[in-house]
Amino acid sequence: EVQLVESGGGLVKPGGSLKLSCAASGFTFSDYYMYWVRQTPEKRLEWVATISDGGSYTYYPDSVKGRFTISRDNAKNNLYLQMSSLKSEDTAMYYCAR
């Protein structure tokens, strides 16, 4: 059974920083590109970041580029999202995805 468990969320003031984690299990983590997406208070789904299977390549929409950093630890089956210079429009529920 594939499981993706996010942690690290919370309330942050504008301009603040936050790091999210995602613990993956039930599949060979290192074989997959991984993603962060978010659901806004208006229930709109937005893509936030993508990282390649080996972690060498990362992709972001312009809305978060330069502020968010996706990374991964294939030895620990963990995915991360470092968010900085947070804005009110970043308010959302964040999810990792395979």
UniProtKB/Swiss-Prot annotation:
GO terms for cellular component: extracellular region; immunoglobulin complex. InterPro entries: Ig-like_dom, Ig-like_dom_sf, Ig-like_fold, Ig_V-set, IgHV. One of its GO terms (biological process) is immunoglobulin mediated immune response. GO terms for molecular function: antigen binding. It holds the Pfam family V-set. Keywords: Adaptive immunity, Immunity, Immunoglobulin. Residues 1-98 form the Ig-like domain. It comes from the Eukaryota. This sequence belongs to the VH7183 subfamily. This is Ig heavy chain V region 6.96. It comes from Mus musculus.
